[in-house]
């Protein structure tokens, strides 16, 4: 194993249009095959659409959507004496943001709209209203943690 320790965390470059690190993270999650300009046009198009449909600041809409998707608790597999338990653990804030963005983009990709911009826009709007597949994923995660609460003492 390497003895140098963990790699230092690189600072996130702030988005040039909205001055928000969240938008930068969203662009990086959309990114495929290194085509950053394509990812940026998808995200900016979706945020412009959010501005048109809500009449408000699109970054606020995105933050509201993320707050509705962020999990507070999740389950991790833990092997104890030959059987595997799903142990509920709290989610760190950075991980919850990352998971929320990952779920938002993942379920936007599965939607049926014609362009990725429309899919992302509608998933963000649904999530900000407490609807959509990403919010359902969070509810399922919380339900799973709640049903396995008996194993919470196996935490590490």
UniProtKB/Swiss-Prot annotation:
The keyword rRNA-binding applies. Keywords: Ribonucleoprotein, Ribosomal protein, RNA-binding, rRNA-binding, tRNA-binding. GO terms for biological process: translation. GO terms for cellular component: small ribosomal subunit. InterPro entries: Ribosomal_uS7 (IPR000235), Ribosomal_uS7_bac/org-type (IPR005717), Ribosomal_uS7_CS (IPR020606), Ribosomal_uS7_dom (IPR023798), Ribosomal_uS7_dom_sf (IPR036823). GO terms for molecular function: rRNA binding; structural constituent of ribosome; tRNA binding. Pfam families: Ribosomal_S7 (PF00177). Belongs to the universal ribosomal protein uS7 family. PANTHER family: RIBOSOMAL PROTEIN S7. One of the primary rRNA binding proteins, it binds directly to 16S rRNA where it nucleates assembly of the head domain of the 30S subunit. Is located at the subunit interface close to the decoding center, probably blocks exit of the E-site tRNA. Part of the 30S ribosomal subunit. Contacts proteins S9 and S11. This is Small ribosomal subunit protein uS7. The gene is rpsG.
